């Protein structure tokens, strides 16, 4: 792996009906931003080969929306370890990824 892209989840919907913070979905604005970022990264030739994302609904939705808009087809690993993770925990998760990818996106 040579490049790591850090992508923050899109704007979440505080008005949605959700139980716990972990279940909060993207707002329409967040979906639009994720699509825009997916297309941007593809246009910039920064298409991720692999993805690593938090199990939070808004993070998974951000990744799925960006990937669809950008035409990304690489595998994704969803992990609870990234939800509310410390910088050290994020680094451990990145280090656990395989080296066969040139570009990894972390959401």
State each model region's role:
Residues 4, 97-106:
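Generic beta-sheet signal
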Residues 19-20, 91-93, 107:
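Surface-exposed beta-strand edges and their flanking turn/coil or helix-capping segments
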Residues 82-100:
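Short phosphate-binding loop-to-helix
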């Amino acid at each position: 792996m040579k490049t790591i892209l850090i992508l923050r989840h899109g704007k979440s919907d505080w008005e949605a009906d959700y139980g716990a913070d972990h279940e909060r979905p993207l707002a329409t604005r967040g979906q639009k931003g994720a699509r825009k970022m997916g297309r941007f990264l593809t246009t910039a030739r920064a298409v991720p080969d692999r993805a690593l994302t938090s199990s939070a609904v808004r993070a998974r939705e951000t990744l799925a929306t960006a990937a669809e808009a950008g035409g990304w087809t690489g595998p994704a690993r969803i992990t609870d370890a990234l939800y509310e993770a410390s910088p050290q925990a994020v680094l451990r998760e990145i280090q656990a990824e395989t080296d066969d990818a040139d570009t990894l996106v972390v959401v």
